[in-house]
């Protein structure tokens, strides 16, 4: 059901037409932007409560004054309404809802779904088909887990392109960390069993897994399968050893601890996780709030939204009672297909965990606010130095990175008054220019970034920093002029005397030059943005350069065409395997004679190339 926009929306009349069924309601402004999404056990009663004439707080009063229309979706239950509400908040980001910011930056353990699953570290969107375990507190924790997985279960970690083209086992097999499914050294049934056990381990079921392995070991021994029994014994021993090293508290076997701190219209939710008694560390989240949401409301929204995306443990400790706790508990239990308990009145060790999480949430929030305050002060100093009338809301910076003209990459980083906005960073692979021409590279990057903004009516920065002197600045200025963009302030950041930090010169589009000095907060802000652009550019350049060099080594050898190159890489499982081979071994590849093998070996090892006469490239 939906009401179309009206000058004075009659919410009371709209509510009277609703049913008493559970569902989700949405409020829209006159420009059709979404203001708020809410759930209701009874739509008529809940929606009507907004328009019953009773006094409302400032946030609600402001929101309701903007409502031009509403619509609703009826659901079968209030629990279903809760799930739909979470999905809509995540996908639509309504202005007045508490919203959990995306946590794509946190790393996961990925176990792919394919005939021969691989296990690997994953960060970013979940585009790969598989199970994602986590998120973990950091990359180190993921690598420790992967190390255990390889030792215990010998699952592959190689990319599919390498896996499909190997003809002999890799080093991981030689050191006992992979079962070499790439060359059929493990039966499919045995590999799938290892995958199943690894899944149990990652789900926090190591005790159950240990009992299962012990039972299988006893069965193998009774059946006189002593070799299999010995392998299972070693696996069980490794598992027990790992448990003894990492066990923290048997009573915290599968547990999350959540605490919420609020201050100055901002909030921090701190998550402390235990899985199978192992402390996985803490993660901090800063939900988007409206300044008037209570800590209880923020924590309730966090629990609903976070566990809609991540598998909940059986027990979740909260530092305070939250609204709709029973409903949220029921919804989480139904989705997880096991009982999930939300608790806040706890004693003993668990009370200690809550106290620890609460203190850390407060400390983390204070640290974040202090950092934001300093960042805002620097942003304000930049505004004053550049003589801008309004606050600097968005700064972008471009930098170019290459090695003697090779693999040129341009970076664009974005900052607002609170710091970096990493989700909006961009890299541009530069092509079609004279190698080493930084001016042309800068112009191409600026044109590509801002042409799209013009075509899609995208956001423009208030200040555009160019890492370079007057030449690079002129190229950026010309590119913007060609696109008809005039309301962006351009600033070139030229290196100072002896390239020393703090001595940079800021070159404006009108030719003026500013030298604010090392103590200037404005220059410190610019340095921070410029250094981040440099880091982002050089990281992209190194990746592109490495990829180009890996693929071009064979292409540079006379007598190696596409078919021979593919045969060589397939035979040796990649360039690393080929480089480790001797001339005689290379010559055994179909289509490669001794002379060509000698040239391949010489090229890969930096030796003088033999004469290529008489060879052709198939």
From Swiss-Prot:
Gene Ontology molecular-function annotations: DNA binding; excinuclease ABC activity
Keyword entries, A-Z: Cytoplasm, DNA damage, DNA excision, DNA repair, Excision nuclease, SOS response
Every UVR domain range: 207-242
Domain GIY-YIG: 20-98
Annotated function: The UvrABC repair system catalyzes the recognition and processing of DNA lesions. UvrC both incises the 5' and 3' sides of the lesion. The N-terminal half is responsible for the 3' incision and the C-terminal half is responsible for the 5' incision.
Self-association state and partner proteins as the record states: Interacts with UvrB in an incision complex.
Protein name, per record: UvrABC system protein C
């Amino acid at each position: 059901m939906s009401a179309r926009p009206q000058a004075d929306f009659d919410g009371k009349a709209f509510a009277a037409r609703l049913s008493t069924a559970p569902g989700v309601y949405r409020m829209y402004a006159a420009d059709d932007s979404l203001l708020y999404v809410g759930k209701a056990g009874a739509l008529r009663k809940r929606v009507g409560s907004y328009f019953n004439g009773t006094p409302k707080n400032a946030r609600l009063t402001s929101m309701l004054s903007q409502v031009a229309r509403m619509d609703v979706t009826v659901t079968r239950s209030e629990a279903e309404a809760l799930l739909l509400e979470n999905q809509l908040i995540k996908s639509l980001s309504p202005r007045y809802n508490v919203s959990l910011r995306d946590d794509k930056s946190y790393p996961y353990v990925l176990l792919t779904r394919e005939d021969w699953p691989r296990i690997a570290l994953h960060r970013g969107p979940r585009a790969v088909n598989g199970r994602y375990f986590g998120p973990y507190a950091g990359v180190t924790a993921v690598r420790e887990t992967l190390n255990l997985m390889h030792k215990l279960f010998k699952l592959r970690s190689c990319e599919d392109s390498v896996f499909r083209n190997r003809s002999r086992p890799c080093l991981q097999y030689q050191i006992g960390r992979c079962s070499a499914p790439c060359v059929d050294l493990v039966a499919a049934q045995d590999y799938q069993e290892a995958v199943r056990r690894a899944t149990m381990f990652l789900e926090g079921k190591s005790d159950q897994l240990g009992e299962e392995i012990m039972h299988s070991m006893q069965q193998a021994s009774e059946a006189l399968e002593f070799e299999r029994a010995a392998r299972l014994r070693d696996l069980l021993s490794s598992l027990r050893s790992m448990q003894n090293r990492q066990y923290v508290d048997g009573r915290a076997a599968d547990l999350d601890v959540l605490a919420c701190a609020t201050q100055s219209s901002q909030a921090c939710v701190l998550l402390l996780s235990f899985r199978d008694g192992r402390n996985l560390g803490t993660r901090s989240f800063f939900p988007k709030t409206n300044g008037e949401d209570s800590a209880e409301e923020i924590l309730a929204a966090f629990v609903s939204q976070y566990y809609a995306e991540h598998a909940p443990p059986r027990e979740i400790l909260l530092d305070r009672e939250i609204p709709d706790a029973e409903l949220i508990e029921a919804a989480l239990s139904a989705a997880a297909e096991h009982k999930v308990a939300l608790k806040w009145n706890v004693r003993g060790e668990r009370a200690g965990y809550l106290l620890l999480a609460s203190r850390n949430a407060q400390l983390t929030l204070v640290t974040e606010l202090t950092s934001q305050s300093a960042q805002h002060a620097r942003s304000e100093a930049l505004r004053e130095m550049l003589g801008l009338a309004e606050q600097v809301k968005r700064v972008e910076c471009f930098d170019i990175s290459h090695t003697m003209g090779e693999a040129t990459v341009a970076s664009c980083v974005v900052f607002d008054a609170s710091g970096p906005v990493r989700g909006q960073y961009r890299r541009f692979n530069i092509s079609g220019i004279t190698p080493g021409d930084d001016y042309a590279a800068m112009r191409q990057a600026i044109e590509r970034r801002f042409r799209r903004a013009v075509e899609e009516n995208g956001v423009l920065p208030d200040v555009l920093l160019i890492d370079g002197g007057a030449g690079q600045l002129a190229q950026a200025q010309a590119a913007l002029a060609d696109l008809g963009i005039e309301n962006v302030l351009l600033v070139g950041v030229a290196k100072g005397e002896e390239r020393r930090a703090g001595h940079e010169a800021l070159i404006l589009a009108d030719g003026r030059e500013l030298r604010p000095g090392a103590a200037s907060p404005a220059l410190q802000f610019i340095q921070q943005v410029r250094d981040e652009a440099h880091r982002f550019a050089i990281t992209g350049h190194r990746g592109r350069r490495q990829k180009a060099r890996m693929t071009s080594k064979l292409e540079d050898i006379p007598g190696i065409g596409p078919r021979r190159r593919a045969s060589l890489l397939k035979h040796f499982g990649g360039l690393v395997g080929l480089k480790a081979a001797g001339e005689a071994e290379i010559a055994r590849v179909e289509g490669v004679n001794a002379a060509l093998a000698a040239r391949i070996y010489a090229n890969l090892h930096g030796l003088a190339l033999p004469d290529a006469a008489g060879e052709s490239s198939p």
